[in-house]
Amino acid sequence: MSQTEASKTPKIPDSEPDGAKGKGKQQLETYRVYVVTWNVGSRFPENISLRHLLGLQDVTVDEDVKETNAHMPDIYALGLQEVNAQPQQQVLGLFKEDPWTHKAKELLRKYDYVAVKTEQMQGLLLSMFVRRQHVEHLQDMEAEFTRTGFGGIWGNKGAVSVRFTLYGCGLAFVVAHLAAHDHQLDERIEDYKHILENHHYHVKRYREIYDHDYVFWFGDLNFRLQGSDSSTEVRELLRDESQHEALIQRDQLYQVREKSQKAFQVLQERLPAFPPTFKFREGTSEYDLKRRPAWTDRIMYAVQPLNRQPGMHLSIEQCSYKSHPLYTISDHKPVTSDFTIKLYPNVRAPGVVFSPLSVWKIGDENTVEYRKQAEFDEGPNDWIGIYPAEYASLADYVAYEYVNQAESPTSSDSNHEPDPFETPSHHRRGRHHHRNRQRLRRQQEANSQEQVRLDFADDVELRHGEQYLLIYFRSTGVRGVTSLAGVSGFFVAEKRHGSPHRTEYHVD
């Protein structure tokens, strides 16, 4: 079976965006979003390549990475269902990232992408990757999950999501796994309603899924074909291309979204022009006739007319919608979709500006200096992480300091380790270094900005001769909302010579 792609359809009507708050003239520019959904059937990504799945089969890496990926996605959303969630795998997940996220990260890092957020609920996994040039502009990242299995008690079914604000617009990515089997249509509709009723965020203006400027909803939604045809009869109809449109009209998702409008009516979808993606005999592209073939794996989208601003229009276009029959490790075929969206590249949230730092003396105390912009508000759990220059994930920090805990020695008793993915673990190399003195000094400036100095302890373990950078995170705490407020330039770690001393760096 060859890969098929839908013919291009017009984009949905324009709508107007949330009010922009950046400085200067607001202009819209085009960005690309690439969405993946795949029920992997508890299989591991062994002996397979993800290049085709991620649209990289024709892309090579050369010395000029920025030129290479000029037309590549700005955002990847990898949504998987039935990731191996056996108890031993869940325990292992406390100490290392899941194999699927790791494999995607190791491939995408070659093209200058960073894993910025991962959320998992049992076998349901969502991993977000963003091109490095956009990472420092990510605001208000938050993850949420809703269980729908066994009346909302068990997480084998349900949804996980990641939302963030980028260049003045709110984006929500929701991956779902709904109730299975042909006769469970009403249960799937109830799952959808339950997710909407229980999925809430803590970001002003973006409290619910459909509050967002852009919504991407995808996953193994398990909608089947209406009718009493046998599996063999459906397979025979699929062999007749003239019957494709008649079959898709019988698709339950199409009917509840377009006809009865009982579920997903807010979302848009280009109707699949590819064959049904379920159920296959593993290791083949032949249908397993124990189940009737169905388009269970889907990707939908929406753009919302929030906070109207005259003359400015957001838009979205679904540029491709494909299945990938060459992947045969599970009984589902993966589905991908490539979108273009409009964002405001000139919108910048207030943050911090790091002073130049050229050398980090290994074995010494080092002082980091930064300036808080006038409108920037510190969060109660803000922290600064030290990262390798070529970090591939926001979880790759090697050391960190909490800002507010450093200000008062009596408040430095917490052993909580920050995690941008908001799933605390204790295996990270980063450590919170305590001192019985005030390690943070503030100086108010005349322009309502504040100059801040923060000491890092002398036992920060960096590698001699390698480059690093600093990232300031504004955070409300574990499973809270996280924003990137500033990224420093590169600096080199060098071994100290002579007796220990504190090294301070100042603005030139």
Where are the regions that the model predicts?
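N-terminal, active-site-proximal structural segment of metallo-dependent hydrolase catalytic domains
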Residues: M1-T118, L124-L125, Q184, Y192, ...
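Amphipathic alpha-helical protein-protein interaction segments
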Residues: G24-Q26, N39-R43, H71-P73, P87-E97, ...
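Residues that flank catalytic or metal-binding motifs in active/ligand-binding sites
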Residues: Y31, D74, G123-L125, N156-V160, ...
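Short, flexible loop/turn elements at secondary-structure junctions
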Residues: T37-F44, E82-N84, E119, R131-Q133, ...
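A Trp-anchored, charged/polar loop motif used as the substrate-binding/catalytic surface
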Residues: N47-K66, G149-F164, K193-R207, F218
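Catalytic lobes of large eukaryotic enzymes
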Residues: T60, E106-Y111, V174-A179, H183-S499
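Structured beta-strand-rich core segments of catalytic domains in phosphoester-bond hydrolases
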Residues: T68, A85-A172, A176-A179
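Compositionally biased low-complexity segments at domain edges in trafficked proteins
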Residues: H501-D508
